[in-house]
Design a protein with these regions (language model features):
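Single conserved hydrophobic/aromatic residue that forms the stacking wall/gate
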Residues: 1-15
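Short, motif-level signal for alpha-helix interfacial/capping segments enriched in acidic residues
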Residues: 4, 65, 114, 302-308
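Soluble catalytic regions of membrane-associated enzymes that act on cell-envelope
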Residues: 232-350
């Protein structure tokens, strides 16, 4: 061949090699951008969860014991524990979008509807999470415990519950905080989705077996990390609420628990076989048998096995008073360092 022709062929081969390398780099960069898109949303969601926990920490009128009151390191540990639990919920939500973008990257398919679906998915599930987190603030303030499956008992009294929530002015701030968080997150997710879609779509190119292998390996590692985040720990059992307990203070121990996580786990626990309502025999048959054994007909409106007791002598009118204090903590007693004098009679009996 003529030297000039040979040189032109060599230049053509070199250009093709450079183009192929650039295409491979673009494909890897596309998947990297997809991962960056998911990571940013993940971090933004964790910041919102941190905000809800901070509001709960500052809004609860709680008196720390003297040994914890000025121990900021111990108080900060609750927020670190909270990040751990928040990440579990965020990984639950992250898993499906991560798998979808992994599959679309392997197929070199980047469609607008994919990012639109992922945006709606994030907005829907994080909105639900923020509603639960916002509801946890007044719930914790009233019951001194993280929101759990007991709230389902109120669903049968929808009108009464709504009236109680909307009629209490102290609940307005958590409601406002939840709505603002949903709006801010929705706007952020939509903007990020639009930005990364155009950024990834502008780099569209062909895909080679080597590219697929690299994307498959990177995606498998990321999905493995996400599943590990859902599990929460390397021990035999996955993360549990008890992992948040690290001190003797009941408030700090519960502060680290994510409300969504606690509601989810308590609901699952209620539906376990060993916790379900036992149907050993028909209820009416059991009542009839007990009435026959006890020789009672019961008192309507009180109990089917109740009986009326009539005193033969003159009653002495003595009373037995029982005091039940729901979610009462020993730290609120003067004996354990409280200066509020909330329970003077209980303190005198201790």
């Amino acid at each position: 061949l003529h030297p000039r022709v040979r040189r032109q062929r060599q230049m053509c081969i070199r250009d093709r090699s450079v183009t192929a390398c650039k295409n491979q780099a673009k494909l890897i960069q596309q998947f990297t951008l997809s991962l960056l898109y998911l990571l940013i949303i993940h971090i933004v969601a964790l910041l919102f969860f941190f905000l809800f926990r901070l509001v709960l920490f500052t809004s609860i009128d709680y008196q720390f014991p003297p040994d914890i009151q000025n121990n900021f390191l111990m108080q900060a540990t609750a927020f670190i524990k909270g990040l751990w639990f928040d990440n579990v919920i965020a990984c639950y939500i992250l898993l499906l979008p991560l798998v979808i973008l992994w599959i679309t990257a392997l197929c070199n398919y980047h469609s607008k509807w994919v990012f639109r679906f992922i945006s709606i998915f994030f907005i829907l599930f994080y909105s639900l999470s923020f509603i639960i987190s916002a509801a946890n603030i007044p719930y914790f303030s009233y019951f001194f415990k993280t929101i759990n499956s007991s709230i389902y008992n109120w669903f049968g009294y929808g009108a009464t519950t709504a009236g109680m929530v909307l009629g209490e002015t102290s609940f307005y701030f958590p409601i406002f905080l939840g709505l603002i968080s949903i709006l801010l997150l929705s706007g952020s997710v939509l903007r990020l989705s639009s930005y990364f879609y155009h950024l990834i779509n502008s780099k569209s190119t062909s895909i080679s077996p080597i590219n697929r292998l690299c994307i498959f390996a990177a995606g498998a590692v990321c999905i493995g990390l996400c599943l590990f985040g859902i599990r929460g720990r390397m021990g035999y059992n996955p993360i549990r609420v008890s992992q948040a307990y690290y001190c003797t203070d009941p408030f700090l121990n519960q502060l680290g628990v994510n409300p969504v996580f606690n509601l989810l786990t308590s609901t699952l626990d209620d539906n376990r076989k060993e916790n379900r309502y036992l149907h050993l025999m028909p209820e009416q048959e059991a009542i009839t048998n007990m009435q026959s054994i006890l020789q009672r007909k019961g008192i309507e409106g009180i109990s089917p096995i109740a009986r009326e007791v009539k005193c033969a002598a003159v009653p002495t009118q003595k009373n037995v008073v029982l005091i039940f204090m729901e979610s009462m903590s020993a730290n609120l007693m003067e004996h354990f360092g409280s200066t509020e004098k909330l329970t003077p009679f209980l303190d005198s009996l201790y």
